[in-house]
Amino acid sequence: MEQTHGICPTLSTAAAYDRCTTVRTRLGGTDLFGVSWRISPCPLRLSADELQFFSALGPHLLSFYRGLNRLYNESVKGLQPTWVAAYLDQGKPESLLQYSRMKRFRDEVPAVIRPDVIPTQDGMVITELDSVPGGIGLTACLSQIYHDLDEGHSQIIGGRDGMVRNFARMLRSHQAQRAGCVAILVSEESKDYRPEMLWLAEQLRKEGLSAWCVEPREIRFTEDGLWLDADGHEQPIGVVYRFYELFDLLNIPKAELIQYAAKKGRVAVTPPYKPALEEKSAFALFHHPILRPFWEKELEAECMTQLTRVIPKTWLLDPAPLPAIATIPDLYLGPRAVARWTDLENATQKERQFVIKPSGFSELAWGSRGVSVGHDLPQAEWGDALRNALASFPTTPYILQAFHKGRLFEMEFLDEGKAAVVQMSGRTRLSPYYFVSDGTVKLAGILATICPADKKVLHGMKDAILAPCAVQTS
């Protein structure tokens, strides 16, 4: 019997319904969030131990990013295996690689850290890291709404305004002594997230930070820096929050001017232009036995132990042939070691407990696009997915990752068709948001996405419940 986790055991049916309609009304009142998910009457409650896990995870992941950054830089210089940088650079334009390696940006790592965490029967598992995540504004808005439902008694993780205030603190730390405002640049490719970023910019202004969400084409370049028109007044830009993907740079108006301004120190840009730090194959590098001495030296013992526990086994799907006597490290089909990727094509459904997905730098590398779950596919389709991944290596490397099944949660949501609150059995993705300010990490909030139990890939969808997380009270 899998563990279940109810969230609103003390609410009457009428009270639960009223709370859902209040949430829907508040969201509708923003005129920004088209509610395309199921609304729960309560936040998802985590235990004190689970909160402790997430509080400790942020510093561990910052250490991981710093270690990955060092590993890449040392690989470029030949101080670590050169194949590390070769893999992380695969499929990237040379101009971007040279820019990312500039001395000015050498120590920069993402200031927003958001792992996707799956609660399983055996503990938490991180499926991937996202340094350009959506959901910041949405999680901030939901945190405010659910906090207000209980007049602050629900103990929302991060607090009512934790997402906004910690995001503002992170941006101020990047601004340092630079004059000017914050420009949240949202590309056309990311336009679905523009409403929440507009809302977030408004909240930042209420916190006293001059911040504006604009399209890249709206900014103006001069030799003195970047400018934007806000409320009828032209303002210098001190910080650019990059809400666009690096693979999309050729489609970003004025992208080269933004890079030039950052190179000259006229503006700070975060997340940094470092494609090596946005590859899912980083998890494969963490588990690679040749690199274990590096990680053990780079990370503190507790950090190494915890990350080994939560980062799933991952392999980069490189089609290069292995010597006849070699095997792929720690990859097995049952008791059998795997020496060739083609061995996986004939794996049974039970043996296909794997996920194939693009490593990064591709429009297929976010959301559920490009993801193939082995045991959820007929054998022929699994073979096709594997062969396609291997064939894509020159331009878009793919990874193979061990699949971990989420544990079941019993949730309640507002069924619009029935005009009633009903129960759903689902599996959960927890997305904690960490913001880095002056070298320290703060957990600002956690968004729960509860998908129907039959879904293998957990992501935002119309059949999913989205809710902030709170601390379970006794």
Regions from the PLM with identified roles:
Residues 1-474:
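Preference for protein termini
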